[in-house]
């Protein structure tokens, strides 16, 4: 694929004038004679890259003509003869994130030669790592009698997690410079208030330093012991942090809808479980379907932020099993299904339902008006719609309407709150689905944020089995925390490396790998897990596998080693693939006592392949020819090459044939 000057500038970090001076060329077919032989073959470029130019570091410099990095050997005030398109962008992407360490290895070059086409590609392996502190969660170490308070602990954890999943989020953005006093002192992440005070000063006084507060806050969320409850919802916070104005409105509306639905089914479930409840005051009862646009009234009544204290207080009124079903049903919107119910009374939560209105059943009326009502709701949002509104279908003919009424007469006895609640959920789900379609592509990648459903369903299964204990809760908390970090990082890499069209068009992602190493307090490896994926959807497929894998492993906590007959079933539950690491490591992870784990190291490894572009400027080609000839003569005499930036005069071009090829280089081929 042809590379434009602008694309090269974006992906190399150079300015457009620099690339215009460089004159990039991708296909050197019939242009090979313009370059020294070492500059056109994979072996020759490897030799030049390693011993002369040091491309792995040179590509990160400003290489404009006359820039400081170009003044002496081997560039002599000109850009290099090649640019590795996308390499600098990859390094910048990894550097912009909160990794503790980054390594780039196996920088290699490959040739593609066929009649009419001769190109060279570069490839590299990037390994970015950071460690999160998952050590002893205070709830499990400060309790003398854990079993007596197990239900309260479980309810508290669920309440905090649900608040994080359903509470409305507001982005927190800082601009300008933040200065903090006390150079060299340890800066704690929670010292943001002190930073705000120091930032008021007009100038920077002695003893102050500029502090990357965003980096400090990210480090804060790497430590479960310190951030405690604030760890929940980290992935969603960063998602909305990166959203534009339109996406913020849509994402906030989606969360309001999920919150309203959760509050609605909780109130309905609580009402069923308390038959002696007092009737609701008329002012709080919604009469349906008289309110044709009932969604607005629904949101107004139910979208108050989910409160942790009120959720904890539900312990006596709503069994944990039903609470979990309600959570799964709300968080999985617009997918999933409504929570099962066996109550057939005409209640519908705080809605007052009338069996028939104007000769038509309530639920059927809502169903018929659903599409038009949803369109009106979206049209009232303060955003410009990206998709054209599809007009609602025309009303059915009188004959069909009469037949429908006859069917409703027959099915009148079947009209129940089960159908009504299903219609409420179907309407909310369809509305959320439509709002997600209105999101920009960068904000629509919800596949990275659906991991919560897997964990809630795992706890639901444990609750059904009566297997909630300290071990399962500890692992549930720890793996949920790990999943938050994994989702956040994979989403970031997806946005920068796959969702950025210019990079995705020219640079191929060959392999994406996540390595999870659990370590004890001495730093020893307790177990290690590996997940690999390739292709266009590598990041989302990795997240789906990791989420399912960790959630399934929660159910094995505290059970010790797996028996032979259990291993095959467990491998099926985690959807084991051959590229998921050693089976013994997986079994060790399932059987380990999680109190031994002090930290979890997450490594994100990427193998990418991108294009090499050649210069068409004669002056750069001539300098390269003279540099290669001089370096080849030094190598032939077993002398050391000058260090990059050495004050070596530009050597003259020796007379006669070109110097011999570097080791491993192939001669030119003519087709």
Swiss-Prot record:
Chain segments carrying region Disordered: 386-411, 645-671
Q: Where is the composition biased (Pro residues)?
A: 649-665
- Location of the protein in the cell: Host nucleus matrix
Q: Where is the composition biased (Acidic residues)?
A: 397-411
Q: Which domain of life is it from?
A: Viruses
Q: Which GO terms describe its biological process?
A: DNA replication; viral DNA genome replication; viral DNA strand displacement replication
Keyword entries, A-Z: Covalent protein-DNA linkage, DNA replication, DNA-binding, Host nucleus, Phosphoprotein, Viral DNA replication
Protein family according to the UniProt entry: Belongs to the adenoviridae terminal protein family.
Can you state the subunit structure given in the record? Heterodimer with the polymerase; this heterodimer binds to bp 9 to 18 of the genome. Interacts with host POU2F1; POU2F1 binds to the auxiliary sequences in the inverted terminal repeats and tethers the pTP-POL heterodimer to the origin DNA thereby participating in the assembly of the pre-initiation complex (POL-TP-DBP-NFIA-POU2F1).
Listed name of the protein: Preterminal protein
Q: Name the source organism.
A: Human adenovirus C serotype 5 (HAdV-5)
